[in-house]
């Protein structure tokens, strides 16, 4: 009986949270400018944008909140990819980013390597090999799993010191290659 009395306030508190309406209303939508690409020109650049945790539901929620308009709608090409990992049902950004960066599945927590831990070539590597200028722009740390998938190689995304060292050597190597091409 005492236990029931002690749990009653917790249950009532939880019930009141469930009854509370959970909505977000954007008082004024963000203005979205329509961008029209020039006609008849060959496409010269590719920009791959990866939003962290950006599922279709997240995009749809943002689109709905902004009354059916997003800057993303200006993108000429939008794609989906299945980024599940090789050894687990649910992926992480290390394995998921590696799938995007290299086109190959890898193990959970791996960054830029195959299932045996061997380095994989990324889109950045392939473009650079064709003499294209490349770059990685981030709003997080470069050694965070998703950007690291494009320029680093490690079986453990948490091995930050090794990944930082790999990114520094990669950046130095790429700078040397760029100077050589000039």
Model-derived features with residue positions:
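Short hydrophobic beta-strand that contains or immediately precedes a catalytic carboxylate
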Residues: 46-51
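Conserved small/polar residues in nucleotide/adenosyl-binding loops
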Residues: 171-178
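Active-site nucleophile/metal-coordination loop of metallo-enzymes that catalyze phosphate/sulfate
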Residues: 21-42, 56-158
